[in-house]
């Protein structure tokens, strides 16, 4: 049994024999003596640095009581290594001798082994017994790092403390300092579990003592333990902030000097540390700061045991909680980086319950401290690089009264909060006003830097708000109580601060977003306040609006709104102009008039940019555009290209309006009015624009897409085919298509027989085509509108604009009431009609050939007649041409075509009465009347249309044949007309044409034959 | 004295400290030689010099005291060690040690304790026996709170800071047994199992078991060397570490739940560690019981049997009350086996202590003390005690009974020792069997007869002889 017991004890003995602690007490005693004296006790020689360090390491392993002395001794070893390291770097930099470099290298190599051994021992100890070694080694390492950083900061090899990365690179390349850093990191990692405060406190104290040379240590440690360093640094800073006399004003006043000297370095160190970490760990810093703010307001946890480590200690201290908000404000004041990190999201935490708690906290503060805090908050808001827009929204939302009903004699907490935010907002505006106008005041709690007035200060709050102009304008235009006043004032400050570009943007946004005249008045007010300090605002604003339109950032509603607002701004001047003649205008009216005139000029300068909007797909936008353009004047220096583009857009819009008018008469009518006004202005601008407008109006009226507006018939597919064949040379129809269509049939285009397509052999006559008839009233209305526009355009002469054109509708047949039509304008219409109706230019001369000669142009004549059949508007247009004498001369080819086809019709007609051909009868009467109006026929001949309804077809033919003979004998030439200045018209003297008696002989014959029914008309035909 | 002080103020801290030591040596040595009797108290001026120039407590507000660096402090410690090593007269050493480190109740005591800790720690490393002997006396005379602090410093140095440094501490057992005895007492006062930090480190436990197993008399060293009629100062450490060690053995199973949680978290390894701890505590318990038996012999030799208090009843009562509170608190957390183990150990200790005269306590009082403890069979046996005899026979029975037991007690333990070791290794609950030899002397019950029915166990065959012998006078 005893042997078994001894066997059990034997392994322990063997285990002990293998441990390195096999020094005898005597040997340890000698080691201690050697360490103290630096002399080897057995050989009596002096220990080298390396041997002395190794002796220290042995004591560190074996004699616990020597640990502090050993660490103290090792400070010297590390210092010597660093000195050699830097000296070696400097020697290399200076290209020193090889021997010196070799010596330094040997020295560093020797000590490096020692340092590695020390590091290994300490690392092992920290790993095995963290609670025992970590506090000791961490304080030793941090203090030594601080000393080394400061001591060697002046060396040539050491970079300047401002270049943190270079400093970090240098020190981390040195084995000694890298070893210390790793030791400290290991200690900090170990101590996180139970008392991180002590570790971070040492770091902070060393940072205060050795900053800025020590910053690289903080940066490195912060990168390794960002969360812990951030939270502990903030907690330690808060405690220090409270300890340095924040608690009472009396204490502050008593120890002002001491507090200032001792307070700033600590919080400055906190700011420096967090500043270094912000480049990579801004999110962590933000979370910690916001969590700190939240915890300071939340109820402390109940029944939670007090942690001895103090990790969460500050949350349980009422005093520290109360000091948190001032501490955070102070931090933000000292560090723009921290201010930027927090201000972005801080407003999200400011919910009503949080605000109530804040108010409860601050009620206990003395008034002076509260005022200082408010001033500091205002300063911070103005200096916040980001999040300013959200802060502003929060303040405005909270400060806006929610209801006009008085809540009662006792104000509720919400009222207090609202009043506080109101006051804060007022202070902010005042502060910004001072900053913007660069008038620092003696009472300013935070005096500005001493920059010269020539260089404006940068205000981060306003810098950020410049990107939120649209939102600010939208909020301002809501016209809420007091809110829009604040925001309007802020817009003024922002515009003055930002310069013309910001002011332009603000005005542009107001013009874009205002929904009614009341809201639009804000733009006038803003312009009033800004025009004194900024010039050229409105041209820039309109240019900005144009740019906005080009980028298509606005939706349809916004685009229409913008155009309407601009039009309203322009119209206000005209109204004032009308009223200004007889009455005295007020100051506001004068200002508005001034703005209106400038807007008008600016819009005119950008007219070519607005005119494409006339053709916008949305009716609201196009209507607003035509309204704006109708109020504006065309610039004097408008280029022909721009002018033609505007004319084309305006004419296209006119036809769109006519179609819209059919759908909604009320709105369409208003829009048509704007369009007519615009076209009149364009026609009155110059002869070029007049010609362009008239030409495009004619072409538009004859366009297939618009024929139905004026009673035009829908085309028959068969007719279309025939027409297509006839128009091959003009339309460029593919011959291949034609050949495919008819197979082996040969196209006899131009052949006289191909025109008469009466039907299909074996199937009888072609069935008659029944077209869709549009609403007669609508057609009549559109016709009247078109004629009115054309008359207006023809009445205006280039270079002689009229103030306002009359909008009266005149009957086309009542020539006496028509205003005088410009001959050149009528000529434009005539030429355009000929170009659009006559398919070819052959035989287009003005003179009339013999009637038999018309056989050669029968196909063309029939085509022209069909055009008139499909487009009744042509009759009215010709009438306008006739009114503008001598323009009808240029329509000879059209007149001949119609007369020729009518002669053929009446000759071949077998009807007993002409009333059986109503279209032909009407056309015959109209044609003769028109030629009479155009003074191509003498009155005695033009009056024959009155007897046509009473004659037989043959008799009508005889009379029309007489007309042809007269035209052949008296060709219509413009030269035959004479201008009468008093009436503004051209007249033709028929007496110079010779005797007309021989041309009226057939008339008399017909009259004699029908004397019983036409006797009362004989006087109309007396020569 | 003023002249000396002014001269010292002009010197560097280390030189000044040396001069103070020299001054102490000269003055105190002379005083001892001149007076025939015990020396009088230290002069106040001497104490002030020591405090100002060795412990750097400034006496003048206007003068900032110079502090030594850590290396200089180490030099001073080395000088003190050398001085005590070279001083041949024990009386002078004691006086000077007392002059340096006797607590004065002022703010210098903190510096005193710091330097004392370093000095003793260093002396352990380099095995300075004179200092260790002086420290042992210091531990004997100083309030337990300060003793605990010194123990804490030493435990941190040798059990926590430096790995494997415990072997250095282990070696001083042969050099200074008195210091080790006092250190054990202080260490048991330091570690009370209240938290993880205040649980004895495994290395320390192993070392103590080794010390006591090697030389059980170590635990009685202070007791034996103390004057018989001397009364302990109020608040000082106990006269022996027996009660402290007993507290450890009883409380260890109740603290097992923390270790078990750790085992669950870390896996099987910690489970094995727990088993190793249990084995160590079992060995420690056995050693304590053996020391009680040795104590009986000593008391008998001094003719102080049942007259001298070794385990104060008040301390035992406090332990029992604490165990009761712990059992009640930890019942939901622990297995019943752990509680039973703790109570078994308590019962065994109480039985042996009362039998050997270490604990003077009537059974009626014991029953009252243990009334709130959970049920335990062995404890019930201990509390019930022997059968009450008729009055005419009680007086002649007792004197006859005890003399007969004493001569035969050591011999039965010898053959049982290996048996108990063997049984203790695999199954710690079987330590209950270690108490069986004591039953025949005090508790003749039928269960003993039941044990005789297990013929397979050869050690039990020995019991009939023992059983027959003590019962012969009764029958």
UniProtKB/Swiss-Prot annotation, chain B:
GO terms for biological process: RNA polymerase II transcription initiation surveillance. Residues 402-444 are annotated as: Disordered. Its main location: nucleus. Keywords: Chromosome, Nucleus. Transmembrane segments: none annotated. InterPro entries: INTS15 (IPR027844). GO terms for cellular component: chromosome; INTAC complex; integrator complex; nucleus. The keyword rRNA processing does not apply. It is found in: Nucleus; Chromosome. It holds the Pfam family INTS15. Residues 416-430 have a biased composition (Low complexity). Belongs to the Integrator subunit 15 family. Component of the integrator complex, a multiprotein complex that terminates RNA polymerase II (Pol II) transcription in the promoter-proximal region of genes. Component of the Integrator complex, composed of core subunits INTS1, INTS2, INTS3, INTS4, INTS5, INTS6, INTS7, INTS8, INTS9/RC74, INTS10, INTS11/CPSF3L, INTS12, INTS13, INTS14 and INTS15. The core complex associates with protein phosphatase 2A subunits PPP2CA and PPP2R1A, to form the Integrator-PP2A (INTAC) complex. INTS15 is part of the tail subcomplex, composed of INTS10, INTS13, INTS14 and INTS15. This is Integrator complex subunit 15. It comes from Danio rerio (Zebrafish). The gene is ints15.
